[in-house]
Amino acid sequence: LPPEKAPTYRDRAIFSDLDQSLLGDREALPEFAEFLRRNERTVTFGIATGRTFGSALAVMRKYGIPRPDVLISGLGTRIHYRTVLSEDRAWTDHIDHDWSRPRIERLLRDEPGLKLQPQGRQNEFKLSYFYDPELAKPVDGLVDLLHRNELTANVINSFGQFIDIIPARASKGLALRWVALRLGIPLEHILVAGGSGADEDLMRGNALAVVVANRHGEELSDLVDVERVYFARAPYARGILEAVDHYDFLGKGAGDPADTVPESGTSPS
């Protein structure tokens, strides 16, 4: 099916990060896969990951994760649809506006504390570096450097040791909004799952969100008082299923503000 003509009976969706949200508890993956199978007529399944397209497919095969209906890869720089995973070229045309990867790479070539990651972690719209905060400029300093050279981009710091530079129009959250519009699914009927700081923009907005319990969950602690963000007690895939119950996601009330305020006193674990 063309991406803009999703079946009308699929009126809600679940989008999850891979590494910090689904992977980490292999025993929970069959239960999550069975949940998707039981609800495939009503729930669109999506992945939103920082991994490249090829790397994401490889790790999903390795861990037996069902092939998603939508795959957002490269931190929101590429979108593929359906089981054949055809690419959304309109999205790549959209994010290409004012993007100049060669100029950014030349500008940062001699910057201390930055080292290009291997080619397999790069794509046309994602420039990825290893980051040494002891030697490199802070993230705000890198953004200022780009602006002084009339370059616009999103600069994302993950785990304090990686820097990704992507187009100003690209991010996981912006890609999710684009997909929601294409599929005709209200953001209030979308559950997004994340587990690290790289997922923060994905979790802000009108979608329902869950921070699964893992060792990087504290990076999202600023969201603890944000409505529609639930901090699960269970880790990884079980945390996503916990959020499905918390939000009554499959019931008629999914997305009802009265039902989606996080529990009082809930905090990251």
Name the predicted role of every residue range.
Residues P3-Y9, I166, G173-S269:
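Mg2+-dependent phosphoryl-transfer enzymes with acidic/Ser/Thr/Gly-rich catalytic loops
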Residues P7-E27, M203:
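Asp-based phosphoryl-transfer active-site loop
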Residues D11-I14, D69, I190:
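The start of beta-strands in P-loop NTPase/AAA+ ATPase cores
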Residues S21-D25, A48-G50, A168-R169:
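Short, flexible loop segments at the rims of nucleotide/cofactor-binding pockets, characterized by
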Residues P30-Q119, N214:
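Active-site phosphate-binding/coordination module
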Residues T42, P68, G113, E150-T152, ...:
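A generic structural signal for alpha->beta connector loops
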Residues P102-G205:
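Conserved acidic, metal-coordinating active-site core of Asp-based
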